[in-house]
Amino acid sequence: KAGEKNAVVSLHIYDLKTKKTSKVDLGKYTDFYIPRIKWTNDANVLSAQVLNRHQNNLDLLFIDGNTADFKIVLNEKDKAYVDITDNLTFLDDNSFIWTSEKDGFNHIYHYDKNGKLKNQITKGNWDVTNYYGFDNKNSKIFYQSVENGSTKRDVYSIDLNGKNKKRLSQNNGTNNATFSPNFDLFINNYS
């Protein structure tokens, strides 16, 4: 209920071989949530997003699955709140794609495996309104945005380096997409 204390959150890793559980020491955090947990492409590294109660300060942690030690690879702060999404995508080299409103608009960013910004993939005074995914074979990102006007949502592809942007939707209005698993085909829903 609003105003009541949050549940106490803890994070543990269970090793199937040794049958031992390791607790991740999150003692530096108080009154927090863990809204997302996801394995990276490194089999021994777990990612966890730790968010303060006010939901305006988020740390992305990389946790060593063997030792339960962690490092903060990314921090997001906002005066109002940090939007939680399921857009975190790990690439083969364990670099990752992340969406953020840190420049005032929701855009797509590429970070290396240590959390160092490689490049801002999308840029402009408009928002990415949906992140559809990453085509590893062709190094392309697929997304929806309002870059053609606030009442128009179009579907795009763009290279990981931020070049070769291509509008995929043909009609003006609201376009949504559902992509095939290999990103070779998509269904365009238009209204």
What are these regions (language model features)?
Residues 1-191:
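Beta-propeller folds
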